[in-house]
Amino acid sequence: MTTNNNWGYRKTDTAWKTPYEIIALFADVVSTGGNLLLDIGPREDGTIPKEQRLILTELGAWNKKHEKAIFGSLGGIAPGHFYGPTTISKDSTSLFLFVQGQTSGTIMVKGLSNHIKEITVLGNGTKLKHKVVGKISWSPVPGLVYIDIPKGVQDKYITVLELKLDKPVTLYRGKGGFD
């Protein structure tokens, strides 16, 4: 991935990506278990353009704040369970949700069979509330998990939530309550 439109430095290329765009792409790549190759092209004199320094500084600060969800983590849960990138801790007992563009309100996770012990906003430690809706006691189909995100806890780029689970992540992938 380039930070503008060219690999290497080109004086006329001023179409810089924003830190948000790079961080969002990075979160998507990490959620699939991948690594992001990010091109940094120094000028002829060896200096790094200020636009690239900003991207690197912001990406580095965001990584440090959310390192628990990035370094040593595994690719996340299958698409459709949460609408955004996810990762899983190495022992699979924490699920990390990367919440993009959400200022406050409610997000939803589908098909999570686990009991959630605690939900924390990475980087600031805020504990969040959740509720499970639609779970029927006699059915293996889990309910929908709704997580309330209050105003003021969001990261300026992408907020990361840690769901601490009772056991390794278990997702319901069936077709209904009778299979």
For each feature predicted by the language model, list its residue ranges.
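Mature catalytic domains of secreted/periplasmic carbohydrate-active enzymes
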Residues: 1-179
